[in-house]
């Protein structure tokens, strides 16, 4: 064989071997990436205690995890000052996450259409950095769970801070009070911070119960019936204010007055691990959070936000977003409760056994043809019509939440307040109410106040 032919014959296997080695390297690299993703999924399941009912569901959750890791890469590319990756929500589809944790869009959209009368704020004197956590005005991060109650956590977080800034001890207050009892909002199906402030002032005398006496139990998505009695009052508010849609004004008000309730577009929050968001999705408000501080000394400057997704998400439950560029639409719906000066908490409400008596009379002066019946407070009482009532005794008034279409205190309701120990004319006679500790009258029905 000629020498040149022999050289060609020798070179050919060498080339083939090199190509085979290259292909093997690519295959091994691909396998390594796949194994890495599977290892991350296994670590995710272990960290968050994830257990799936069968192999089909596990495969579905793995695909969701894979998609979320790809989304995390996209977010990281758009936000060079932040990191994204595995979070407690990494096995959820984007649609599931939106429905469970970002379900307030309709409430916030309606609120944006209303005419807001904002408070006047003097700008230009705010310090370069504020963090109300360092001043003892922020309770530990809480967990809303599988309930669309972010609005309640935002409202209560604001009141906790305002109460402390007014000179009172910091106390953890009850989100469950709002989720179960606020008749303006929709519990786990969404709500609005301004609505919650209004309900507290107009229907609950401005009082807010403590977390210890009325703990949060709606993390599983269930919404227990309202129970107004037997709870300790931990704080009280007199009003609320809306702030201008201006970040300088928001910073000035926060620096002087404490944490603020705000709404944001939380689409970019799902895969967030830490750092400062500078390219936050800003399409529509859908989530309520608490603004607790800012830092203008940083580059970029940032806001500090407390979330209600546990301390296993984000920066121990917090997120930072760039200040001055309306990231996540953060300046669109900012509000705060108003608290008076430092005062001791109001006295506790009557004990669970408290009752009230209705004197129903045929005449208009509460003197002729009268009958008397005693009913429990804080419990569902059926009326002589088709409705039902939950009543609460106050110092001088009786508050009734009337459910005109339900015999089980559910559905649409109307709150009213009537004076105690005073004759009140109604369409079919007159009534008078008295708070007492007498035992309830058996099988009695309340004559509805008309």
From Swiss-Prot:
Keywords (alphabetical) are:
Disulfide bond, Glycoprotein, Hydrolase, Lysosome, Protease, Signal, Thiol protease, Virulence, Zymogen
| Location in the cell | Lysosome
| Renumbered residue ranges of the record's region 108-residue extension | 343-450
Q: Among the record's GO biological process terms, what is one?
A: proteolysis
Per UniProt, what is one Pfam family of this protein?
Peptidase_C1
| Broad enzyme group | hydrolase
**Pro-peptide positions?**
21-125
Q: Does the keyword Disulfide bond apply?
A: yes
Give the active-site positions.
150, 287, 307
Tell me one GO molecular function of this protein.
cysteine-type endopeptidase activity
Disulfide bridge partners, by residue number: 147-188
* Glycan attachment sites: 120, 397
Per the UniProt entry, the Enzyme Commission number(s) are 3.4.22.-
Consequence recorded when altering residue 189 to G: In strain: Rhodesiense WRATAT 1.1
Q: Where in the sequence is the signal peptide annotated?
A: 1-20
Example GO CC term: the record gives: lysosome
SUPFAM superfamilies xrefs: Cysteine proteinases (SSF54001)
Tell me the PANTHER family matching this sequence.
CYSTEINE PROTEASE FAMILY C1-RELATED
Miscellaneous comment in the UniProt entry for this protein: The 108-residue extension appears likely to be processed in part to produce the mature enzyme, and may be involved in targeting the protein within the cell.
| The protein's role, per its UniProt record | The cysteine proteinases have a potential role in host-parasite interaction and virulence.
Q: What does the similarity note say?
A: Belongs to the peptidase C1 family.
Q: What is this protein called?
A: Cysteine proteinase
Source organism? Trypanosoma brucei brucei
The root-end lineage is:
Eukaryota, Discoba, Euglenozoa, Kinetoplastea, Metakinetoplastina
């Amino acid at each position: 064989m000629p020498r040149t032919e022999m050289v060609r014959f020798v070179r050919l296997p060498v080339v083939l071997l090199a190509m085979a080695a290259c292909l093997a390297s690519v295959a091994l690299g691909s396998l390594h990436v796949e194994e890495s993703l599977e290892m991350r999924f296994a670590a995710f399941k272990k960290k968050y205690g994830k257990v799936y009912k069968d192999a089909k569901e596990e495969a579905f959750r793995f695909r969701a995890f894979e998609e979320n890791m790809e989304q995390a890469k996209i977010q990281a590319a758009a936000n060079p000052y932040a990191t994204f990756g595995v979070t407690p929500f990494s096995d959820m589809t984007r649609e599931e996450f939106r429905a469970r944790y970002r379900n307030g869009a309709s409430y916030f959209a309606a609120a944006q259409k209303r005419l807001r009368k904002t408070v006047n704020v003097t700008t230009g004197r705010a310090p370069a950095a504020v963090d109300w956590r360092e001043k003892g005005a922020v309770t530990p991060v809480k967990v809303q769970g599988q309930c669309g109650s972010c609005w309640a956590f935002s409202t209560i977080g604001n009141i906790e801070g305002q109460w402390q800034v007014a000179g009172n001890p910091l106390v953890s207050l009850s989100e469950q009070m709002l989720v179960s009892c606020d008749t303006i909002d929709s519990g786990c199906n969404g709500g609005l911070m301004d609505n919650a402030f209004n309900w507290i002032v107009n229907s609950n005398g401005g009082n807010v119960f403590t977390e210890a006496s009325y703990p949060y139990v709606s993390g599983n998505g269930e919404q227990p019936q309202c129970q107004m009695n037997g709870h300790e009052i931990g704080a009280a508010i007199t009003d609320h204010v809306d702030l201008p849609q201006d970040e300088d004004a928001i910073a000035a008000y926060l620096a002087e007055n404490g944490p603020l309730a705000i709404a944001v577009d939380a689409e970019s929050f799902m895969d967030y691990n830490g750092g400062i968001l500078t390219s936050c999705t800003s399409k529509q408000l859908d989530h309520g959070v608490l603004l607790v501080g800012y830092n203008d000394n940083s580059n970029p400057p940032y806001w500090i936000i407390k979330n209600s997704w546990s301390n296993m998400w984000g920066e121990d439950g917090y997120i930072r977003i760039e200040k001055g560029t309306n990231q996540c639409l953060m300046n669109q719906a900012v509000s705060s409760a108003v608290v008076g000066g430092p005062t001791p908490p109001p006295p506790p409400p009557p004990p669970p056994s408290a009752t009230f008596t209705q004197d129903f009379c045929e005449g208009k002066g509460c003197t002729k043809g009268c009958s008397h019946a005693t009913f429990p407070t804080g419990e569902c009482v059926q009326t002589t019509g088709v409705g039902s009532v939950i009543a609460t005794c106050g110092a001088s008034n009786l508050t009734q939440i009337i459910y005109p279409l339900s015999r089980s205190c559910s559905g649409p309701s109307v709150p009213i307040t009537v004076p105690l120990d005073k004759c009140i004319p109604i369409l079919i006679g007159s009534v008078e109410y008295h708070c007492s500790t007498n035992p309830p009258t058996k099988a009695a029905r309340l004559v509805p106040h008309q």
